[in-house]
From Swiss-Prot:
Reactions mediated catalytically: (6R)-NADHX = (6S)-NADHX; (6R)-NADPHX = (6S)-NADPHX
Naturally occurring in which organism (per UniProt): Clavibacter sepedonicus (Clavibacter michiganensis subsp. sepedonicus)
The protein, known as: NAD(P)H-hydrate epimerase
Domain YjeF N-terminal: 11-222
Binding locations of (6S)-NADPHX: 59-63, 128-136, 164
Keyword NADP in record: yes
EC code(s) of this entry: 5.1.99.6
Assigned protein family: Belongs to the NnrE/AIBP family.
Length: 229
């Protein structure tokens, strides 16, 4: 396991992507390791009850889909809402594990809210650090999160676990250009801390941050943020 960074160190998204590249080229199972760590935290935060997983089109959604498959194999009732027009290839693993995947456009706001009310846990796997434009949610992703927010913020709402970074939070600056963001109870981040979890509004929205070591070598990179000690 890599010891090149700790949760106290926040590295720029570009540096993290550069550190991932050689591992991906060598066929390293980064996503598998990340998903196992995400599933482990989900089990700890909500040991029983249904799980609702929100996924986008990128690798963040892939991590969440593999974690959904792991939880379904535990015997959990897991459902996925696809918030983008495309879905990561890991959807096949989730489907093999018996996880139903529903396109967001097939659910109205009341149905989205009902799924959240029936869930013990919501996993936010919509956007990750690969987002290069504004992190603000758009389209169906924004609509789904807006429908969930009253349930999440209400009494007795489900636990929210964010995958790598809460969707809608800027990875490097922690800024939130649109308040339509699910505030996480726990953020499971991969490889190294993200500055956006330590700065600006993103710090409060991240909740407790758990680091999953995926073996990144960041020895040549300089941290750009440090968590408060």
């Amino acid at each position: 396991m890599s010891e090149t960074g700790s949760i106290a160190d926040g590295y720029a998204a570009a540096d993290i992507r550069a550190a991932e590249a050689p591992l991906l080229a060598a066929g390293a199972q980064l996503m598998r390791v990340a998903a196992a760590g995400l599933a482990r935290v989900c089990r700890a935060e909500a040991p029983s009850g249904p799980v609702l997983v929100l996924v986008g089109a990128g690798n963040n959604g892939g991590d969440a889909l593999l974690a959904a498959a792991d939880l379904a194999r535990d015997g959990r009732d897991v459902r996925v809402i696809r918030t983008a027009s495309r879905i990561h290839g890991a959807a096949a693993r989730a489907a093999e594990a018996g996880v139903p995947i529903t396109p967001a456009e097939e659910l109205d706001d009341a149905e989205v809210a009902a799924l959240a009310r029936a869930s013990a846990l919501v996993v936010d796997g919509i956007l990750g650090i690969g987002t290069t434009a504004s992190p603000a949610l758009r389209g169906e992703a924004r609509r789904v999160v807006a429908a969930l927010l009253p349930v999440i913020l209400g009494a007795g709402g489900p636990v929210v676990v964010a995958c790598d970074i809460p969707s809608g939070v800027g990875c490097d600056d922690g800024q939130v250009p649109d308040p339509t963001v699910l505030s996480a109870d726990v953020t499971v981040t991969f490889g190294a801390g993200k500055p956006g979890l330590m700065r600006g509004p993103g710090r409060a929205l991240a909740g407790r941050v758990e680091l999953v070591d995926v073996g990144l070598d960041l020895s040549g990179a300089t941290p750009v943020a440090r968590a408060a000690r």
